[in-house]
Curated annotation (Swiss-Prot):
GO terms for molecular function: endopeptidase inhibitor activity. PANTHER family: MACROGLOBULIN / COMPLEMENT, VENOM FACTOR. This is Putative protein C3P1. SMART domains: A2M. One of its GO terms (cellular component) is extracellular space. The gene is C3P1. Gene3D superfamilies: 1.50.10.20, 2.20.130.20, Immunoglobulins. It comes from the Eukaryota.
Length: 363
């Protein structure tokens, strides 16, 4: 039987130009050889067209299987003279039973019962042991090194992917922290709503992934508490009182109905950390922000604002999440094709963040 060795988690990444078609529907046949994984693959096509935007197709599923195959359960590593057990599991999906013989191939470098002739055994010899006492007096302070989780072993397709996050620059980030727990763009400036919510979102995501907790949960939740108490208005939207140094860092929400876009950004961050910070005012704040966006949604005019508001409402489980986004889609029936230009950096193009938020809101 052929040996299966190719087990990628993703593999089909191709870029091609669709031919023109009078009917408006183009076809591009391709022939590929699927990997050795016995699983179900999902294919999604993303297309771009000048002057129109982004189109995402519905997922197409392809099931790969073999009627009969052998699965060897091998250890992840073996050292010299170690005794290991190799188990062979046979899978038969045929309509009839099969009588087979599983034989381990003989190798000179391996000591196995499959070796022809009398089996050998390992001899023992006496070992002289000498002990020394050593006093260690380490200099300096204790140093800690964080090692991210590494659980790649036994990962196969159709298994929920592990999320691996490397958190760097935590101490440098603390230099932008004010005495009240907020974050500012430079010393002397008041806390920034956008920057504090962004830091809260990143740290909330990193908190659950750290093997050794270096992030204080109380300080993390204090950020959310400050945003809610100090920067949220009665109608649910969030205010920005800190100066904006680089508008390009803010995903392009400057000039895109800022009250809506900023509220959506903060709502996304609060949703990321709601499982960690369970204070009562957090869920009440999320409800007020969701209500504000739902009231504003029918009147939104800019592409970025409707994209990020739709994604924020989708995270908040709002039934109105895609009500306005559909009106920005192309009437050609494409999955998601934004047809309203968004001015960004002086060019009449749709910003990449707007495309990403649009795709996330319908995924």
């Amino acid at each position: 039987m052929p040996v299966r060795t190719l087990f990628p988690e993703s593999w089909l990444w191709r870029k091609f130009t669709l031919p023109k078609s009078k009917s408006g529907i183009s076809h591009y046949p391709i022939s590929v050889k699927v990997p050795d994984s016995i699983t179900t693959w999902q294919f999604v096509v993303v297309s771009l067209k000048a002057g129109q935007g982004l189109c995402v197709s519905d997922p197409f599923e392809l099931t790969v299987m073999k009627s009969f195959f052998v699965d060897l359960k091998l250890p992840s590593s073996v050292i010299r003279n170690e005794q290991v057990q190799i188990q062979a599991m046979l899978y038969n999906f045929r309509d009839r039973q099969a009588k087979v013989r599983v034989e381990f191939p003989h190798k000179e470098t391996l000591c196995s019962a499959s070796k022809p002739g009398a089996p050998s055994h390992q001899a023992g010899v006496q070992i002289q042991q000498t002990s020394y006492s050593i006093v260690l007096e380490p200099q300096g302070q204790t140093q800690t090194k964080l090692v991210p989780r590494q659980e790649f072993l036994n990962m196969v397709p159709d298994t929920e992917a592990e999320v691996f996050i490397s958190v760097q620059g935590y101490t440098q980030m603390l230099t932008h922290r004010s005495s009240d727990g907020t974050y500012h763009t430079s010393k002397g400036n008041p806390g920034s709503t956008w920057l504090t919510s962004y830091v809260f979102r990143v740290f909330a995501l990193a908190y659950s992934m750290m093997t050794t907790q270096v992030l204080s949960l109380s300080s993390l939740c204090d950020m959310a508490n400050w945003i809610i108490i100090d920067r949220q208005a009665e109608d649910g939207h969030f205010l920005e009182k800190g100066p904006v140094v680089m508008t390009s860092m803010q995903d392009g929400y400057q000039g895109s109905e800022e009250d809506v876009s900023l509220t959506a950004l903060v709502l996304i961050a609060l949703n990321e950390g709601k499982e960690l910070c369970r204070q009562k005012n957090l869920m009440a704040s999320i409800e007020r922000a969701r209500g504000f966006l739902e009231r504003k949604l029918p009147d939104i005019q800019t592409t970025f604002a409707v994209a990020i508001a739709s994604y924020a409402l989708a995270l908040a489980n709002s039934s109105q999440a895609n009500d306005c986004l559909d009106s920005f889609a192309s009437p050609s029936g494409c999955g998601m094709l934004l047809n309203q230009p968004q001015s960004w950096s002086g060019e009449g193009v749709i910003s990449n963040p707007a495309m990403c938020y649009s795709s996330l809101s319908v995924s």
